[in-house]
């Protein structure tokens, strides 16, 4: 497995991008602080890989910033695990790129 990305050395709060497309706003409205969300990397071979954020149940909510998502996606594809929880959910009058903030944290496979 590749080395842990530097962005995961400590828990990291980051906004989720793309929360206003399709049915994502409805999924966003179901989330609250403390909820666990699912992180899914793009499949291998994608030119600009990223990590997608899904609500419990599987609905897509958005994606990570490319500077975080690209190294994290490669690491996850290679077997790394990362968990995430909702840190903040803003109302519809909050800028879309700041509407959902999650906390990323490395997950030790041996501890699961």
Question: How would you name each of these model-derived features?
Answer:
Residues 1-112:
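Conserved active-site motif detector
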């Amino acid at each position: 497995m590749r080395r842990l990305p530097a962005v995961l050395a400590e828990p990291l709060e980051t906004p989720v991008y793309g929360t206003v497309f399709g049915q994502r706003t409805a999924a966003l409205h179901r989330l609250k602080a403390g909820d666990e969300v699912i992180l899914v990397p793009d499949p291998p071979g994608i030119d600009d890989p990223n990590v997608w954020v899904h609500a419990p149940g599987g609905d897509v909510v958005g994606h990570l910033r490319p500077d975080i998502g690209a190294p994290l996606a490669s690491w996850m594809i290679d077997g790394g695990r990362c968990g995430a929880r909702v840190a903040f959910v803003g109302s519809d009058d909050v800028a879309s790129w700041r509407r959902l903030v999650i906390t990323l944290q490395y997950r030790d496979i041996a501890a699961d």
